[in-house]
Structures are given as C-alpha cells and as structure tokens.
Amino acid sequence: MNEIINFSVQELIDKISNSQVTSVEICEAYIERINKFEKDINAWAFFDKELLLEKAKESDAYKKSGKPTGPLHGIPVAVKDIVGTLDMPTECGTPIRKGKSYSQNAEIVDLLTSSGAIVMGKTATTELAYLNPSKTKNPHDYSRTPGGSSSGSAAVIASYMAPLSIGSQTGGSIIRPASYCGVVGYKPSFGLISRNGALKTSEKLDHLGVFGKSVEDIAYLVKELIKKDSHDPATVYYSSSN
C-alpha cells in the first residue's frame, strides 16, 4: 500500500507546502487504489484519471511559480454526483441525466477551487438522492449496503480512494452511510454551507456536508466551505474560526 493514502489532511498539506510530495504523487497514489478496488466497490459515478492528473500537474506548476496558494492547495476531494460541475457530468444517479452536465459549477465547487483543492471525480448516489439504491458496495463487506444516498462519498473514504469527499443529506444521507462505512460524516447546521448548484429535493431540509477519515481532516475542509452565499438565501454568516 502506498503510504501517501495513510497521511492525514494536515500531513498532506504540510508535505505539499514543504515540497516533500507533489499533488501528482498524491493523485497517483489514489489512482492506484481506485484501479485496485473500484471494480468491486463501484463508488464512482465519474472518474477520469487523465483529467485528474492534468489538474494535479497544473496545481504543482502553480505552486512552483511562487504564487500564493490556498489552504487546501493540491488536495484531491471527491464530490457527490448531485453537485454541479462544468468539466464533469452531473447525472444525479438517474439515466434521465446520462452524460449531462450543469451549466455552471455549484458554489461548493467554486469554494473548493478557490481553496486550491482539486475535484477528483463524482461519487455515486441513489437515484435523484432518494430513490433506487446506487451500484455501490460497502467496502468492508461487498454483500452489504454502504447506506445512502451519499453511498459513494462514504465508500471512497472507507476504501481509501479519496482523502475527503462531499455528500448531501435531506433525511439521513450523510450520517447513515458514514455509520455503515465506518467513517466520519459531518452534516452541518442548516444554512452553514451553500447548496446553490446542487440538486434540490427539499428547500428546508437539504444540506451539503463532508466525509473524511477523522474529525481533524474534515475540519480543514469545512473551514473553507462555511460562507454566506447570496444565491442560497438559507445561508447565514458564521465565522469558521468558531
């Protein structure tokens, strides 16, 4: 096993900052893991290793230029396939949207990019985030469910195919798969993270949240996502330092 996939987010940040590891090396380590386990787990709705490596090379070149970098520079993050992305399909787990993309990035994707993170691919979801189960298997026992609807987002963390991931919850779609897959899931208080650009199922109940291997890992990501957004009137100002 490549030791890189065992590093905490803090360790990855520090090693990138100190030029001890590159974003390409990090992404290659996760690609190796995906190549080994994805055929059995089916956690990804969309994954293009060439696109990921291209983004990683751009990230490394930007750092090498000496320009200021964001707090998550070069860190790959998986995103649930109900969150709009311009450069990847957003199929929402339904054949109705096969191969279709959103017309703009979701706010959370723009925040990831602004922080320097790399969107590595789209994770599998139950159909329209609440109907038929996804294709994903529980990484600990392929005969069991990973839980839904954020099935892939939990499974990629449990199987070490990504260091961090974005999920969503309307009923129990973060906390349930986190529990089933044995990872940490964070469903924030309503209004902390913008839902603009993600599939809507309930204006008053929809949340976007985060999966990771530890509370500390999740904290690094959540800190960059808690922002007031004029396009999501539910969002409120809240200092991420709290």
What are these regions (language model features)?
Residues 72-208:
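Short glycine/serine-rich loop/turn segments
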Residues 1-54:
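An N-terminal boundary/leader segment
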Residues 19, 80, 214:
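Short, conserved phosphate/pyrophosphate- and ester-handling motifs at nucleotide-, phospho-/glycolipid
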Residues 7, 47, 151, 206, ...:
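Residue-level signal for the nucleotide or nucleotide-sugar donor/cofactor binding architecture
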Residues 50-60, 113-117:
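Long amphipathic alpha-helix in the N-terminal Rossmann-like dinucleotide-binding domain
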Residues 59-76, 217, 242:
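Immediate post-signal peptide segment of exported/extracytoplasmic ligand-binding proteins
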